[in-house]
Structure formats: structure tokens, C-alpha cells
Amino acid sequence: MSKVLVLKTTAQADEVSNSVALTNRFLEEYKKFNPDDEIIIVDLNKDEVGTSILTSETSSTFYQQEVTKKYINLLKSVDKLVIACPMYNFSTPVTLKSFIDHVSVANETFSYKYSKKGDVIGLITNLKAQILGVQGAPLGWYPWGQHTQYVEGAMRFLGIDFNKTVLLAGVKVAPLLQLTPEQRVETIIDEVIEAARTF
């Protein structure tokens, strides 16, 4: 049995959120393959980790906060991580960026200390991640808006392996615009099922 941490990051209400619909459908399929796994869902909008941001005013104490320790320990205690990753203004939600800031701590989750080549050594090697991306534009419209690649890179930096990212793209233009979030997810259901099977 695996422990699976699921991070909700959307800034929208659940009933209109494409990333919530995608995450729910993924979990539905995942449970078919892994019925005994423990699922832990955390809504970063409702947790301090999603609202405590790194600024010049907070930088001196940011990494000493209990919330930082809590989430590093949580990452070390689970086997799998599911990240709902919608795009807002060509980037990740601020809640997800704040989470990544909180758990990216030198000598806790990554290190250069023992590297022979001077590159980073990720210290969270117990985890496999599944990124579930959503964006309004079709894939390739805005090459600078590669939000899922940023999250993949951040996971790799921390030593986390990941399954092939699932991306639901083009939700704000026809033909997907006219559909409900659940109907949009059905347009990529084969990818969702395959990700659930291999995760």
C-alpha cells in the first residue's frame, strides 16, 4: 500500500475548475489500479503553505517556519505526489510556487555539499510525482508559458522522479470552451487512464 499526497492549487471554485475535474478523474482511475492506497488531499488555498510567500520582508525567517518543516516531513513520509497544476498568466498558481519555495531547502531537500561535479543532489528520493497540467491555450501557442516544465524541473531538482505529465490544453478556446470541465477531461481520457495505470 502506498501513501499518496495530492496537492490542489486552483484559484477557482471546485465546480468550475478544470484542474479539479482532471485531478478527480485521475484519482478515480488511479483507485481502480490501487484500491488499497491511502490518499491525502491538501488544498493549498486553505493552508498556510499556499499563502505564506517569500519576499524581502519574510526571507530571514521563511525557511524556519513550522509549515516548511511540516511539508518537508510530509514529502519524506509519502510514496507518491500528485500535483494539480493549472496555468495562470503563463505560470503556476502562487499557491504552488509558495509550496515549492517552502520545500526547497538546502541540505534538507537538496544539496551541493557532496556533489563531485558541483551540480545539485536532490534529497527527496522516496517519491514519484504525477503532474496534472491545465492551460487555456492550445499547446505551443505561448512557448514562454511552460508551467508544467517548471514544475518538472523543480521536482527533478529535489530528487523526485515523475510520471509522464498529463496536460489538458486549450480549455479557453473552441472546441473545448463549450464543454464542462468534466467533458474537457474526457477528451484526453486515454492519457489519464494510462497515467493512472503507470503511476
Curated annotation (Swiss-Prot):
Cofactor details (free text): Binds 1 FMN per subunit.
InterPro entries: Flavodoxin_fold, Flavoprotein-like_sf, FMN-dep_NADH:Q_OxRdtase_AzoR1, NADH:quinone_OxRdtase_FMN_depd
Any GO molecular function: FMN binding
Entry similarity comment: Belongs to the azoreductase type 1 family.
Gene3D superfamilies, alphabetized: 3.40.50.360
Name of this chain's protein: FMN-dependent NADH:quinone oxidoreductase
Database matches in PANTHER family: FMN-DEPENDENT NADH-AZOREDUCTASE 1, FMN-DEPENDENT NADH:QUINONE OXIDOREDUCTASE
Subunit and interaction comment: Homodimer.
One family name in Pfam for this protein: Flavodoxin_2
Function: Quinone reductase that provides resistance to thiol-specific stress caused by electrophilic quinones. Also exhibits azoreductase activity. Catalyzes the reductive cleavage of the azo bond in aromatic azo compounds to the corresponding amines.
Enzymatic reactions: 2 a quinone + NADH + H(+) = 2 a 1,4-benzosemiquinone + NAD(+); N,N-dimethyl-1,4-phenylenediamine + anthranilate + 2 NAD(+) = 2-(4-dimethylaminophenyl)diazenylbenzoate + 2 NADH + 2 H(+)
Cofactor(s) demanded: FMN
E.C. code: 1.6.5.-, 1.7.1.17
Keyword Transcription: no
Top EC category: oxidoreductase
Keyword annotations of the record: Flavoprotein, FMN, NAD, Oxidoreductase
Binding locations of FMN: 17-19, 87-90
